[in-house]
Every structure is written in structure tokens, then in C-alpha cells.
Amino acid sequence: MPKKDGHTHTQFSHHGTTEPLSAYLSHAVSQGFSDYTVTEHAPLPGAFLAQFTGPVDARDHSAMHEDELAQYCQLVDQLQDEFQSQLTIHRGFEVDFLVGFEQDTRQFLDKMADWTDEIVISVHFMPNKAGQLAPIDYTPEVLAAAFPEIVTAPQAVFARYFDTVQQSLDFAKTLSHPTKIRIGHLTLIRKYQKYFELPVFNHENLLKITTILNDMKSAGCELDFNSAGLRKPYNGEPYPTASIARQAVQLGIPLVYGSDAHQVADQGQDYDILENILNQPLDN
């Protein structure tokens, strides 16, 4: 695994610290990273925000605002020049896949194609039984309110999540510009596994994961190997889990470490742990 942090955030996330991007980059240099992708949450579509029925804070503080986009791009460009002798900086976004808003997302990516080197496509919101796009990683209480089956039938929620991830991958395969694409934190649905005492994935969901991985391989997508779950009190595992990560390696899918840092201290966290996971046999 290259010494690269491929999933990072900035002061524009609105749910992290206000530390400047330059501090993240200096920290990465001090940790021996050679490559760094800035992937702030892309602005969410206005039509999605207008119909969102979840917590106001989740609506307003999940992503960069549209009127900050130019400032974000200018800052990344400036620091790319300033750090060029110390760190290869790639310009990017973490893009939410939102069912029903694919055209809005496509228009944004087309508009930003000339500027963008890499994107992480992630599922943070998925449709519930009422058809509402609800956040899955905001709080355990919000997850349970939108998806009460997480308590009574968790495998059904897992299946709904992986179906949505599959849709995000199908969408990614339709993008025509040569931007490098990673699928973000593949097992984020387990963020609150200790809170809900979630079971391991059943056979049906493991098959869905295998299908996703095979499709990623065919499409030439990378996989975000995300350390954030190790820092979450109700999780304790990376995204994806160790066995899924090793399965991806066996299939020849490139894994890229992602700290998912929203504060400087988290940049580079647990890189060695994730690297060691990939050095273990597949069946461990």
C-alpha cells in the first residue's frame, strides 16, 4: 500500500475542526506520506437539501457549501504549489451518492472534471421504507429512527445499504471523464455495531459484497481502506473490515489508505494497523 492518504478533509467540512489545510499537509509530511488527496465533501444538491427531513444539523453541516467551492479549489491549488517539493497533492472531492439525484451529481462532476484528479464516492444517506433519504452515520438514534429494522432485522438494513453502494458503483461506471474513482468506507453501515450489537454479515450480504468487489475490479475502481472506524467508540474496525479488505487485495483491487481526518491529529492515524492487516493471510 503506497504511503498515501487518499481520504481527507478540511476546514470546509463543517463537522470537523477549523484547523487550516496547511496544518494537515505539514502533519502528513512529518508522518512520511508521499501522496495526499484532498477530498472535501462536495456541496450537496440544492434539491436534496430542500426536501431533506432529517436533523437540521445533518442538512447544514454534512458538506462544503456551494458558495465555498471556489475558495476551496483556490486553496488546494495554492497549497499544491507550496508543498510540491515535499508532498504530491491530488485535488478531489468526497461525493455523496444520493438516490434520485444522480443527474445533479453528474452535472457537478462534469463541471469540475478539469480540476478534479480523484473522487471518493460514498453512501452517507440511503432510502428508508418511506422513500426518504436518511443519514446512516449521524447518530445511533437517528439511524434507528429512520431504519428501525437495524434493531429487529439488521441484515435487511445491511442489504439495503449494499444495494445502494451497488447503485453508486453503477453510477460511477457511467462517468466519462478520466477522474480516478474510489468507493468510500464500504462497511460504514457497521459504524454503530457495538451500540446495536450487530451480527456479522450473513451469506446474502457477503455475496452482495463479493459482487461489488468484482464490479469494482472490472470498472478499475479503487477501494478506500478507511481507518476512521477504528476511532469510533461503537465500531472498532476499519472500513471495510479486515477480511473484506484482504478479499479485495486477492481480486487485485487497489486499496488506498484513508484517514478520513476531520482534525489534524487524525491524519495518518492507524496506517500501520491497516498495512499489517493486508499482510495477513486471507482466511485470518
Model regions and ranges:
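An N-terminally biased module of ancient metal coordination in phosphate/nucleic-acid-related enzymes
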Residues: 1-99, 103-107, 194-203, 243, ...
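Extended recognition/assembly regions associated with phosphoester-bond processing machinery
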Residues: 2, 13-14, 18-21, 27-29, ...
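Divalent metal-coordination and catalytic microenvironments
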Residues: 7, 28, 119, 185, ...
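Glycine/Thr-rich phosphate-binding loops of Rossmann-like dinucleotide-binding domains
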Residues: 46, 129, 233
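Extended substrate/RNA-proximal surfaces in nucleic-acid metabolism proteins
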Residues: 62-215
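Active-site-adjacent C-terminal substructures of enzyme catalytic domains
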Residues: 205, 209-261, 267
